[in-house]
Swiss-Prot record:
Phylogenetic lineage: Bacteria, Bacillati, Bacillota, Bacilli, Bacillales
Protein known as: FlaA locus 22.9 kDa protein
UniProtKB keywords: Bacterial flagellum biogenesis
InterPro entries recorded: Mg_transptr_MgtE_intracell_dom, MgtE_N_sf
Designated gene of the protein: ylxF
Region (Disordered): 115-140
Pfam families associated with the record: MgtE_N
Classification via Gene3D superfamilies: MgtE N-terminal domain-like
């Protein structure tokens, strides 16, 4: 019992003489270093951060925070570059689209111009064809009339009386007044009266 008391007394003596003053010195030294701007905890934090169990308990150091911040800045810069590239690509596509619309409008205008030219040419061709047909028909009528002009009035009267009324009127209208009178005189009174009325009506 007395041996245990002696050991306990020795431990207290060591605690009071060595450990407590040493702890006081460490605390005082840490305060002085902290006041001088020296981070006395950094070496301890770095050592603890390398220990598998303790690294979860140690807060992030300035280096880690700086690295994380640098990584975030790098990611932000990459995203901004991607956004800028996408906007540039959109701008290029919009310009291409505007160019395509302009080209389409130009082609449509050209097509309309060609269609109008083709329509005008077709109309001109039709007018020319109609004019040629009318000229040809008129020429043929003149030939027929000239035949009846040179024919005997009695014979001409018999033939004209057998023709369709429209054809007969064309021939009679093309004759001179003397030739017309001679031919009508060779027709029956009924025929002469009918053709006289038709000729008078056509000349009104």
């Amino acid at each position: 019992m007395s041996g245990k008391k002696k050991e306990s007394g020795k431990f207290r003596s060591v605690l009071l003489i060595i450990i407590l003053p040493l702890m006081f010195l460490l605390i005082a030294g840490g305060i002085v270093l902290w006041a001088a701007g020296i981070n006395v905890l950094k070496p301890i934090q770095d050592a603890a951060a390398k220990t598998p169990v303790l690294k979860e308990l140690v807060p992030e150091t300035e280096n880690k925070k700086g690295a994380a911040s640098s990584k975030d800045s790098s990611n932000t810069a990459a995203l901004e570059k991607t956004i800028k590239d996408q906007k540039s690509e959109i701008s290029i596509l919009n310009k291409d689209l505007e160019t395509s619309k302009s080209e389409i409008d130009r082609l449509n205008q050209k097509i309309r111009s060609l269609e109008k030219t083709a329509e005008d040419q077709k109309k001109s061709s039709e007018d020319h064809t109609e004019g040629s047909a009318d000229s040809k028909a008129s020429s043929e009528n003149d030939k027929v009339i000239s035949v009846y002009k040179s024919m005997d009035s009695g014979k001409a009267a018999k033939i004209i009386a057998q023709l369709k009324e429209q054809e007969a009127l064309k021939i009679l209208n093309g004759l001179s007044k003397k030739q017309l009178a001679d031919i009508l005189a060779k027709m029956t009174p009924e025929q002469a009266a009918t053709y006289t009325e038709k000729i008078a009506a056509s000349q009104e």
